[in-house]
């Protein structure tokens, strides 16, 4: 039934209070700070004037005009923020030094009061020149100011501001002055009181006293201690009435800001001013009442500035309105003047009841009271007269109308029809009055005044107009017009070249001269010692640099500086251009910012300026707090000793490498010429020129190769250590040395080039004679089963057919091993002799077979795929090859990845040569062949099974065979079905093949192998080389028998397929089934079609297929090909069929899978049967699944059909799995925390947080009022009164709520999803542009079967199957059903745990059909977003915790900006949904799918077990893409609403977000978005923050939140079964694992962020240690449920 209208909301008061508190906090955060000391009356005036702005009073200064100055400062901030670089008119002297954005100031020569202002002006800075010129009558010292006034100056500027300096100029004068300046916009602050529109008099309002004598007006505010404003009345009236200026200098005047009668006018030059009527005083609080009897003679004994009394009196509007309402509604008999006087006296008293002002009152003079009573009485009398006359005349008119005859009525009907402009009663015209009549009124209300007047500019006089017409006439006659009256078009002043504020100037800006510093300079290292110390260089390098002197030759051309640095016997070249990339020793990138006109350079924290001087080149260095100047004399220095230079270079290289290994972010890579050079520490475009062509950049810091060394020590171990060369040197090509004799070829050389036809006979004719080397120093480390070997030693000792060189991309000579190859085989680098290329690798046969392989440069980018390809490209050959570890030298590829890549990509018989460092690594990580240990129990059970088997006819061959305890070594090649495991076996590798079935035996025998079934093979496997195919499906006792009897055993099979079945049900098979670990996995299948691969990718995550068949699975079609059934009982009903177990290992072109009802238990208990059935075909498979058995294990057509319907494609994408690792116990500080008492730890936690034991187990919160939607609930709301819990402590630190109660579900439904949604209709472009800071434009996204597999895998992991995925039929309710569940966990809090007034949390689950429809798209969009995230931005959980912690630790000088949304899901509306749809459209999602998503999200029904809610908008936590779109919306709000300074790291997950920066501020467009969407942001900015269960401490890292984790344990029920206690132990153990290395740091940081003692955190860690050891103590308690929902009323209908 519908009952939402009967639900009261006692909790609404709390919600209103919270909303009011949030509004107050927001207002205070944006309040105006009032600094002067004020009286109580001044405070009231200021509060009323500044409404609705919040004021914060911090009195600290005394001001002469406090009210005006506060208003002035506020309007000044507004004007300066919008004007930018501008011209200022009449600037106050005290503001000159504070506003550098002003390019010119116009002053008048000081007279009177202005002289006093100049005497108190600052005497330093720019104000000093202005002060000196103003007081001494001197001309302006520079062009930043003038003393000619605004109208007498012509300095060009596009924008100007005038703060209370235009009161003595009319709008027309200002328009002409703006034209002379070329100004298009002028912000003018003016004081325009409405009293200037009235006749002369003295007017007193609540804020000020105004004296008006008809010519001048003087205004003095309350509390002023000096004279007030004094302005010309006619000008003020012009500014109030004028909205535009016409003539030759047109402009429009718009009031853009007002505080009381202080206005900011925006004057904009416009060619055609349009009407702009405006109401100047809509918030006026005074009404001006006219005095009937004007004053006569002298008003007082003492003369004043005004010779007359006021003819109008300012009366509070509320007094006049109440008086008129009272008098107009009095009875005729009761109306009299005395009664009006009595009422006026009553409402003139101020009445206050407590803090409530019941009557504001009015403190009036006797003249004002007399005038008000007189005016009110006469006005009411006149109105009563009008009322009487109107009724009387109206009655007579009615009598005449109804007495008309037919002819008169017909005449009126024919000739007096009403038109469109007819208004009933308007044509009667009972009464008309004149403006000067007494009946015209006695008061003026400024609230209804409307002005729209235009003022003509003064340049168009009558004579000027006549002469202009005459000129035009002369032009018409063809005469030259010499009219001097025409205004100068485009007058922009005579000095526009040096004015940056004027953008429309036609004068080209003058370019500053660039000083030329070309020449030769001497750079001693001693001159740069302070810089070295600021760079934190080691003392050794500083000392060595101090002993060196360099000569730097500088050439400067077109903003580019080229330097040639001569340091000892080495020459370096650098090129300085703007934007040049600087080499770094970490992932951070630096670009050089170079401005030749300003002679500055900067990059990162380093900057310098240079200038030519008489003494040479003067350079100023700024780095790390250092400000150092050095002067380098011109000339040439003597050369430094080569040994000293080499030692310096080597020490510098070691320092760079050390910094590279230990730095997370990195710094500049310091080159020699970067430290001993003019522009230290920059060295862009670094090139070292060497006379030796073999000594490239890589040998700058190492020993240079020499021909003598190569000849005398051909087997030098370190020849193969360095893998890659760098950029080859620019030196000229020298004379080539004779190659050394290479090793002898293989006894059986390859007949042809690799993968090529037979080469020409002369291909190797030029090769020298090949002889064996006499000395062999290599050491064998390991031999693989395929014959491959790993050696420690030199590559050139190998006798393999091919040698592999670590080359560069251009295959040119370089350093390291490449240099050694060039010394021995220089002809091998001739590109013309390359016989083949495979990818980046090049093959050559001259002078011997060599492969030039190219590894990736890990200094630039980590590219594992390229590393794999580097080895794979060397396998297109015949014969064996000798490899180095590619990339582990100069390119800095780690040893492990390079070795693993070689293991996966080599051919049998190949050799790998390791240097000593890599050899030591290999010996520590030596691969071992797996072993199987047969225990006595296993042997005894296997022998029992053999005895039982030997008693049968099949197993007679096993009689007498026994399994003995021992260790068996084996090789197990596992792979996906159809991967070619069997085809990889050759007859030369095996003597006997053992297979489980006759079909497989026959297949092997057809290939020429001696194949046997398991039982008969017992006679022939003794001492033979045995291959066991489909090993996991062999009976385990026979498998153990053959493995133990064979000389070598090679297992083939798939661990995921059907294992051995215990047909006898004796229990022996599972008892002795061995645990075999594959030694290698093959993931490429040549059998499976693409859809099969994706459907069962959950069992084979890395599977790939070579099949070109995209879709092969079909439902509901006739049977084709081989029929497969699951049970023997189904075979008679399907003639020609075989069971899946019998078909294992077989391959068919077409198959039909028939699932019968008797196979339900088999399929549910063994998903392997379904996998085998699906993987037997190569082209087509028809599934006949009447009982729906395969659908129950996730195999159905609905998922596939919906996937292709949504635009999915078959293909491969990057998997969404993020690699994670467990931290090593390198600093095991957790071991110092012994287990502690659980009770004491929780009691100390309660004491610190202020929580106390509570007598209730749960709370039913009040149900809020349903504001939108329809609620349906059952007639009975039954609840339980108590709850039984197994708890760790009786003190709970979470918000308590009852998850299982019907009333709790009801309150959660209404509270979370029944509130009013604030809609916001606006364009998404601004928010999307802001979001582009974190998520750039995404572009089309491809949805592939990889995302479909991940979706199916996630469903299977959650225990779901495909039965809930239906065909997309929107008429079916099950397709679009959204179910709702109450969440059983609550949020940790340090505040109130019971009386929090918060409703529970819920989970809304979309239908599995919609999840399968949208899920792949959202996964693909998420991958695209992750690929585009900038450095330092972390999304959701898609990162390793150690990476995030390292990024936080690197941001040492940052603060933590932390935001927490309130009601994040509830406030999402049409705008956030529109942003989601806009991003979906940007990614290429089909339009019908976007519209369907918008429809589902905009109107929905949440279906709880017994309740339902029909609502609109909001966000549901269980819908697909919840984390994705919540995180995107969070990113959009944060980046649109806030600007961050020194941004370092940002992390977003759902509604949680942090940003590490030095400062933040709210962006200009934030208020519009926050107010439009009703967002509730709770921002905190502190040194340490909280985010997603971790404590974020800049400079230290992300640390586990011990207090929060321990607090959440107190709320859960850990019973009644032991499995809950085990879950607790595992969860605590996982959490403690994160504390392994940071436990002590957590104690210090977590205690600080929560404000608790470090001893508490220490005690909590000890308590968690005890729980992880299984020593947790649980207490069973029975507590009542606190029901606060008594206000829920239910009506039975």
UniProtKB/Swiss-Prot annotation:
EC number per UniProt: 2.1.1.-, 2.7.7.-, 3.4.-.-, 3.6.4.-
Residues noted as binding Zn(2+) in the record, renumbered to the chain: 671, 673, 686
Region entry NTPase/helicase, spans: 960-1204
Cofactor: Mg(2+)
Entry GO MF terms: ATP binding; cysteine-type peptidase activity; helicase activity; metal ion binding; mRNA methyltransferase activity; RNA binding; RNA-directed RNA polymerase activity
CDD domains from the UniProt entry: Hepeviridae_RdRp, Macro_X_Nsp3-like
Protein name listed in UniProt: Non-structural polyprotein pORF1
């Amino acid at each position: 039934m519908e009952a939402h209208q009967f639900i009261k909301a006692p909790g609404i008061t709390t919600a209103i209070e919270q909303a009011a508190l949030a509004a107050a906090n927001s207002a205070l955060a944006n309040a105006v700070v009032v600094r002067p000391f004020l009286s109580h009356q001044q405070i009231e005036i200021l509060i009323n004037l500044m409404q609705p702005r919040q004021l914060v009073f911090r009195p600290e200064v005394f001001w002469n005009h406090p009210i005006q100055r506060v208003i002035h400062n506020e309007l000044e901030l507004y004007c300066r923020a919008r004007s930018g670089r501008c011209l200022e008119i009449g600037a106050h002297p005290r503001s000159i030094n504070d506003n550098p954005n002003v390019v010119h100031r116009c002053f008048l020569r000081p007279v009177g009061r202005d002289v006093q202002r100049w005497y108190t002006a600052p005497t330093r800075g720019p104000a000093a020149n202005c002060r000196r010129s103003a007081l001494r009558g001197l001309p302006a010292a520079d062009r930043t100011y003038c003393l000619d006034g605004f109208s007498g100056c012509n300095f060009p500027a596009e924008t100007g501001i005038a703060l209370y300096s235009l009161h003595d100029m009319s709008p027309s004068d200002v328009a002409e002055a703006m034209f002379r300046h070329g100004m298009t916009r002028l912000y003018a602050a003016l004081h325009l009181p409405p009293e200037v529109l009235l006749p002369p008099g003295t007017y007193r309002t609540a804020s000020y006293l105004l004296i008006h004598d008809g010519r001048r007006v003087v205004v003095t505010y309350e509390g002023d201690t000096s004279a007030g404003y004094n302005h010309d009345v006619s000008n003020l009236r012009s500014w109030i009435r004028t909205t535009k200026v016409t003539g030759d200098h047109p402009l429009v005047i718009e009031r853009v800001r007002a505080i009381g009668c202080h206005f900011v006018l925006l004057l904009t030059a416009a060619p055609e001013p349009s009407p702009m009527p405006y109401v100047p005083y809509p918030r006026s609080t005074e009404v001006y009442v006219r005095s009937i009897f004007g004053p006569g003679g002298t008003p007082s004994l003492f003369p004043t500035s005004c010779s007359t009394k006021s003819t109008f009196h300012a009366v509070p509007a509320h007094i006049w309105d109440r008086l008129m309402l009272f008098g107009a509604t009095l009875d005729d008999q009761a109306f009299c003047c005395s009664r009006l006087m009595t009422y006026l006296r009553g409402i003139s008293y101020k009445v206050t009841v407590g803090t409530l002002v019941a009557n504001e009152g009015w403190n009036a003079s006797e003249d004002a009271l007399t005038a008000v009573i007189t005016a009110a009485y006469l006005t009411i009398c006149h109105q009563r007269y009008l009322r009487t006359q109107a009724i009387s005349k109206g009655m007579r008119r009615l009598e005449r109308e109804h007495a008309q005859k037919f002819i008169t009525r017909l005449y009126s009907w024919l000739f007096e029809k009403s038109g469109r402009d007819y208004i009933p009663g308007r044509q009667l015209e009972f009464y008309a009055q004149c403006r000067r009549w007494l009946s015209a009124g006695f008061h003026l209300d400024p609230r209804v005044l409307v002005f729209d007047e235009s003022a003509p500019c003064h340049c168009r006089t009558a004579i000027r107009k006549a002469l202009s017409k005459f000129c035009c006439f002369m032009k018409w006659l063809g005469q030259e017009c010499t009219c001097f009256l025409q205004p100068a078009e485009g007058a922009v002043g005579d000095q526009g070249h040096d004015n940056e504020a004027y953008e429309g100037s036609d004068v080209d800006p003058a370019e500053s001269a660039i000083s030329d510093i070309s020449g030769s300079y001497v750079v001693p290292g001693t001159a740069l010692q302070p810089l070295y110390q600021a760079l934190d260089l080691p003392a050794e390098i500083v000392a060595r640099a101090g002993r060196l002197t360099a000569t730097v030759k500088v050439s400067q051309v077109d903003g580019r500086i080229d330097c040639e640095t001569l340091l000892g016997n080495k020459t370096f070249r650098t090129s300085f251009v703007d934007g040049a990339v600087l080499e770094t020793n970490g992932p951070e990138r630096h670009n050089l910012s170079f401005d030749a006109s300003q002679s500055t350079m900067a990059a990162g924290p380093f900057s310098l300026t240079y200038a030519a001087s008489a003494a040479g080149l003067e350079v100023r260095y700024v780095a790390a707090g250092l400000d150092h100047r050095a002067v380098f004399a011109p000339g040439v220095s003597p050369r430094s000793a080569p040994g000293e230079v080499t030692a310096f270079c080597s020490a510098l290289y070691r320092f760079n490498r050390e910094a590279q290994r230990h730095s997370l972010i990195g710094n500049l890579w310091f080159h020699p010429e970067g430290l001993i050079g003019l522009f230290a520490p920059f060295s862009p475009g670094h090139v070292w020129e060497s006379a030796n062509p073999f000594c490239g950049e890589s040998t700058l810091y190492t020993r240079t190769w020499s021909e003598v060394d190569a000849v005398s020590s051909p087997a030098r171990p370190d020849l193969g250590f360095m893998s890659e060369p760098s950029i080859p040197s620019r030196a000229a090509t020298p004379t080539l040395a004779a190659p050394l004799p290479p090793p002898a070829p293989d006894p059986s050389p390859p007949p042809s080039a690799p993968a090529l036809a037979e080469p020409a006979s002369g291909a190797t004719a030029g090769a020298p004679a090949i002889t064996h080397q006499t000395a062999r120093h290599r050491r064998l480390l390991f031999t693989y089963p395929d014959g491959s070997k790993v050696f420690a030693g030199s590559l050139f000792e190998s006798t393999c057919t091919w040698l592999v060189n670590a080359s560069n991309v251009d295959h040119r000579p370089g350093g390291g091993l490449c240099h050694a190859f060039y010394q021995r085989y220089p002809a091998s680098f001739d590109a013309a002799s390359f016989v083949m290329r495979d990818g980046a690798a090049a093959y050559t046969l001259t002078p011997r077979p060599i492969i030039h392989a190219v590894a990736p440069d890990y200094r630039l980018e980590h590219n594992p795929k390229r590393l794999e390809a580097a080895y794979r490209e060397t396998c297109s050959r015949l014969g064996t090859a000798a490899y180095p570890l590619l990339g582990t030298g100069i390119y800095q590829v780690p040893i492990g990845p390079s070795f693993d890549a070689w293991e996966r990509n080599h051919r049998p018989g190949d050799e790998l040569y390791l240097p000593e460092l890599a050899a030591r690594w290999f010996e520590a990580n030596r691969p071992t062949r797996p072993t199987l240990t047969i225990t006595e129990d296993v042997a005894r059970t296997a022998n029992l099974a053999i005895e039982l088997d030997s008693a049968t006819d099949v197993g007679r061959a096993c009689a007498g065979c026994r399994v003995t305890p021992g260790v068996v070594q084996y090789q197990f090649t596992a792979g996906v079905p159809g991967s070619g495991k069997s085809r990889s076996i050759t007859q030369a590798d095996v003597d006997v093949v053992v297979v489980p079935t006759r079909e497989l035996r026959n297949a092997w025998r057809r290939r020429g192998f001696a194949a046997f079934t398991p039982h008969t093979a017992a006679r022939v496997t003794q001492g033979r080389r045995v291959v066991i195919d489909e090993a996991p499906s062999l009976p385990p006792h026979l498998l153990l028998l053959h493995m133990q009897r064979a000389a070598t055993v090679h297992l083939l099979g798939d661990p995921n397929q059907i294992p051995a079945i215990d047909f006898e049900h004796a229990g022996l098979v599972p008892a002795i089934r061995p645990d075999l670990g594959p030694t290698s996995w093959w993931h490429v299948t040549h059998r499976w079609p693409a859809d099969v691969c994706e459907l069962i990718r959950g069992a084979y995550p890395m599977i790939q297929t070579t099949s070109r068949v995209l879709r092969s699975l079909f439902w509901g079609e006739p049977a084709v090909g081989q029929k497969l059934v699951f049970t023997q009982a189904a075979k008679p009903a399907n003639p020609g069929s075989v069971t899946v177990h019998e078909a294992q290992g077989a391959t068919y072109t077409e198959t039909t899978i028939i699932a019968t009802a008797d196979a339900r238990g088999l399929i549910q208990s063994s998903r392997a049967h379904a996998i085998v059935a699906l993987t037997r075909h190569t082209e087509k498979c028809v599934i006949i699944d009447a009982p729906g058995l395969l659908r129950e294990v996730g195999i159905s057509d609905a998922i596939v059909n919906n996937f292709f319907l949504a635009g999915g494609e078959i293909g491969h994408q990057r998997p969404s799995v993020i690699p994670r690792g467990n931290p090593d116990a390198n600093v095991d500080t957790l071991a110092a925390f012994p287990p502690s008492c659980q009770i004491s730890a929780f009691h100390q936690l309660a004491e610190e947080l202020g929580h106390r034991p509570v007598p209730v187990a749960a709370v039913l919160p009040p149900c809020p009022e349903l504001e939108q939607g329809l609620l349906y609930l059952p007639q009975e709301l039954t609840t339980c009164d108590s709850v039984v819990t197994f708890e760790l402590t009786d003190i709970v630190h979470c918000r308590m709520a009852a998850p299982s109660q019907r009333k709790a579900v009801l309150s959660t439904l209404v509270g979370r999803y029944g509130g009013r949604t604030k809609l916001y209709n606006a364009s998404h472009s601004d928010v999307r542009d802001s979001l582009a800071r974190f998520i750039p434009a995404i572009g089309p996204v491809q949805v592939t079967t990889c995302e479909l597999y991940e979706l199916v895998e996630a469903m299977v992991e959650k225990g779901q199957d495909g039965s809930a995925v239906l065909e997309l039929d929107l008429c079916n309710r099950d397709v679009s059903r959204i179910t709702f569940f109450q969440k059983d966990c609550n949020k940790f809090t340090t505040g109130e745990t019971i009386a929090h007034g918060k409703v529970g949390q819920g989970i809304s689950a979309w239908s599995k059909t919609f999840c399968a429809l949208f899920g792949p798209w959202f996964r693909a969009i998420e991958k695209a977003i992750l690929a585009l995230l900038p450095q330092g931005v972390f999304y959701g959980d898609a990162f390793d915790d150690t990476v995030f912690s390292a990024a936080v630790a690197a941001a040492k000088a940052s603060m933590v900006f932390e935001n927490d949304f309130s009601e994040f899901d509830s406030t999402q509306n049409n705008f956030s949904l529109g942003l989601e749809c806009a991003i979906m459209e940007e990614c290429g999602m089909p339009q019908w799918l976007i519209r369907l998503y918008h429809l589902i999200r905009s109107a929905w029904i949440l279906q709880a077990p017994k309740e339902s809610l029909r609502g609109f908008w909001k966000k549901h936590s269980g819908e697909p893409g919840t984390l994705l779109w919540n995180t995107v919306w969070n990113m959009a709000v944060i980046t649109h609403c806030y600007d961050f300074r020194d941004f370092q790291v940002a992390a977003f997950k759902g509604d949680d977000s942090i940003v590490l920066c030095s400062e933040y501020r709210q962006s200009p467009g934030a208020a519009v978005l926050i107010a439009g969407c009703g967002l509730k942001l709770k921002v905190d900015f502190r040194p340490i923050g909280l985010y997603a269960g971790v404590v974020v401490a800049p400079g230290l890292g992300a640390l586990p939140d011990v207090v929060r984790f321990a607090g959440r344990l107190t709320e859960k029920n850990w019973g009644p079964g032991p499995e809950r206690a085990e879950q607790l132990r595992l969860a605590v153990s996982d959490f403690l694992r994160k504390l392994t290395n940071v436990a002590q740091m957590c104690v210090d940081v977590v205690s600080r962020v929560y404000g608790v003692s470090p001893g508490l955190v220490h005690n909590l860690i000890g308590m968690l240690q005890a729980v992880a050891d299984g020593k947790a103590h649980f207490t069973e308690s029975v507590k009542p449920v606190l029901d606060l929902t008594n206000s829920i009323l239910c009506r039975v209908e």
